[in-house]
Amino acid sequence: MAKTNQAITICSLLLLLLLSETTSHLLCSDSKTPVNNNETLQFCDSYKERSCCNSKDDLQLQNRFNSMNISDSNCSSLLKSILCSKCDEFSGQLFGDDDSSLVPILCNSTSQDLCSKLWDSCQNISIVSSPFSPTLLGGATSPSTSSNSSTLTDLWKSQTEFCTAFGGPSQTNNNKTKCFNGEPVNRDTSDDDEDDVKTPKGICLEKIGTGSYLNMVAHPDGSNRAFFSNQPGKIWLGTIPDQDSGKPMEIDESTPFVDITDQVSFDTQFGMMGMAFHPKFAENGRFFASFNCDKVKSPGCSGRCACNSDVNCDPSKLPKDDGTTPCRYQTVVSEYTANGTSSSPSTAKIGKASEVRRIFTMGLPYSSSHGGQILFGPDGYLYLMTGDGGGVSDTHNFAQNKKSLLGKILRLDVDVMPSVSEISKLGLWGNYSIPKNNPFQGNENEQPEIWALGLRNPWRCSFDSERPDYFLCADVGKDTYEEVDIITMGGNYGWRTYEGPYVFSPLSPFGENVSSDSNLTFPILGYNHSEVNKHEGSASIIGGYFYRSNTDPCSYGTYLYADLYANAMWAAIESPEDSGNFTDSLIPFSCSKDSPMKCTAAPGGASSGPALGYIYSFGQDNNKDIHLLTSSGVYRIVRPSRCNLACSKENTTASAGKQNPAGSAPPQPLPSSARKLCFSVFLLLSLLMMFLTLLD
C-alpha cells in the first residue's frame, strides 16, 4: 500500500507539472470563441453573459443530466455544475484538448475544493452512465462494475486516486492554471507584477539589406537562413547575420532560389502575395506560392469564378473593373519542389520553377481586396487568407456568405490528396482535402474549406510561437478603421456588417447586410485612419508578430504591428496575461548608429526616425528576431542600448545570442502540444516502471 500511495503522489506531481504549462485564453472546448448570449440558458443559468453554449447545447446538457438519475440533492447540484462547465468561457482550458470529455479539471488544492466535495457528496450515490468512469480517460482499468449505473467507490479505490485522475491545482498568483470549482471561472484581474510585460520605450533597428521584399519565411531546417520573395514572383534564399556582428545579410539577387515571374500577373494590385514552406521541407522539398495569374495570357490559369450561381452572383452582370472583365484574374496556390537540385532539400540553393500541382484556383470578381497570404499552422495545415473580392464595399456581401470563399480564412490539408473524382464530387477548388475538424463541414450551404469568415482584406497573419492558439490577423479597413483579430475556429469578424467596431452602411444593395450567424467577434486592436495620416486619412494595416526573441527583453511578449505608410508602429500588451484583452501604444523607432548599412533619416531630421518608405510585411527568423520588410530595405530589431534606449532587463555586457549555422536548429521551448506528448510518454514510462517495481 505504501508503494501504491507513493506512486499516486508521483503521478500527482507530474500532473501539476503538466497543468502549469497551460494558458487561459478565452476559448471554448471546441476551439470556438465564446459568444454573447442572445437568450437565457434555462438549465445552465449561471452563464448569463458570454458563454460557449446556445439553447440547443443547454438542452442537451439538461437531457444528459436527467438521464443520470441522481437521487441525492447535494450530489445532483455538483454534477449539474460540472456538466454546465462546458458553457464556461474558459472551457477550452478547463477541458484541455479533449472536447469529448464531460468532466473539466476539478480544483483539488484543499479539502474545500470541488474534487473533495464531489467525493464526499457522491461517493456512494448511484450515477447512470457515470462520466467518471476510468475507461473514459483512455486506457485506465477499473474494478468490475455495471456499465449502466455505478457509484464513485465502484469505479475508484479512494478519493486520492479519484482526485489524482480528475483534479488540478487551484489558481493562485503564481499559478495561472484554470480549474473548475463549481462556479463560472472568473477572469484574472490581479495587479501586474514586476515580471509582466510593459510597453517598451522604443524600438531600435538596424538595416541589413537593400532589397524590397513582400514576404519572409524562416528556413524550416532551423538554421540562420530565410527565404525572401517579391511581388513580381522571385524567391531568394538569404543568410541572416549574427546579432551584433556588424554584417549585412547575405543574398544574391542575381541568382534566385526560384523564378516564377512568367506564371505571375504583376501590377499594383496583383502579383505573388505569399509563400509557404512545408514543415518537413528539409525532408520532402515541398514549397508553395500564392499568386495571381491572367487567364487571357496563361491558358492554364483558369479556375471557377468566385461570382457564381451558388452565391447568387452572375459574372456577366458585373461591371468591368478598370476595363477588366470579371474573373479574368485568378488567385492561385501552386506547389513546387526543391527535390533533385542537391543531395538533400535542406542543402538546396535553388528550386524548380515548374509547377508540381495546382492546389487552389479561384477567379476574382474584381481587381482589389484579394488577400493571398499562405502559411502553415502549428497543426500542419495550410491556411489561405482571402479578401472579399473588392467591388463597392463587398458588393454581394461575399464575406458573410458561407457558400463563398471570399473574405475568409481557409484551412486546407495538402498532405492528403484527393482523386479527380473526389474533387468533382466534393466540389473542391483544387488538389487538397478538408481537415476533419473544420467547422463548416456537412452542410451543403456552407463551404468546408472555411475556418473563419467576415474579413475584408486580411494582410499578414501569424501564430504566436509560444501559444499556438493565438492566431492573429490584421484586416485592412475601407473608410475608417484598421483592425487586428484573434482568429478562432468558426469565428465571424463582422465585415461588411461592421468595419472594426463601427456599424458599416454599404452603398451596394446586393446581399443582405446581416450575418446568418449573429455572434460576431470584434477586434482586439485597431486604429482610425486619422490617427496615422491626419491630412489624407489614408491607412493600411500591416499585421506583425508576438515578439519572442531575447534580443530586446523589454519588447518580449508584445505584439508588434504597423501601418503601410511607415510612420506608425504599435506595441500591444495583453493584460491580464492570456485574457484576450489588449491595449496598444504608438512607439517610436530609430536606427542604430552602428547599423551595418546606413539608414536614411526621414524628413524632419534624425528625431523623425529612419526613412523606411512603405512597410510591406514583418518577418520572423528562427531565433524569433523580427524583421521589417520595407520599400527601402530589410530592417531588424536589435538591442535597445544600441539606440540609447533604456531597458532595465537588457544585459549590456553580453551580446545577443549567436545565430544558428545552416542545418542547426536553435534551442526553443517546446510547443504545448509537444510538451503534452512528452508528458504522456514520460507518465506511461513512469507508471510502467513503478508497476514493475511493485512486482519485485
Swiss-Prot record:
Cellular component, GO annotation: plasma membrane; plastid; side of membrane
Keywords: Cell membrane, Glycoprotein, GPI-anchor, Lipoprotein, Membrane, Oxidoreductase, PQQ, Signal
Similarity section: Belongs to the PQQ oxidoreductase GdhB family.
Any GO molecular function: oxidoreductase activity
UniProt protein name: HIPL2 protein
Lipid-bearing positions (GPI-anchor amidated serine): 672
Residues making up the signal peptide according to the UniProt record: 1-24
Domain of life of the source: Eukaryota
Native species: Arabidopsis thaliana (Mouse-ear cress)
Presence of keyword Magnesium: no
Propeptide: 673-696
Listed cofactors: pyrroloquinoline quinone
Subcellular location: Cell membrane
Residues modified by glycosylation: 38, 69, 74, 108, 124, 148, 175, 339, 431, 513, 519, 528, 581, 651
Membrane topology: Lipid-anchor; GPI-anchor
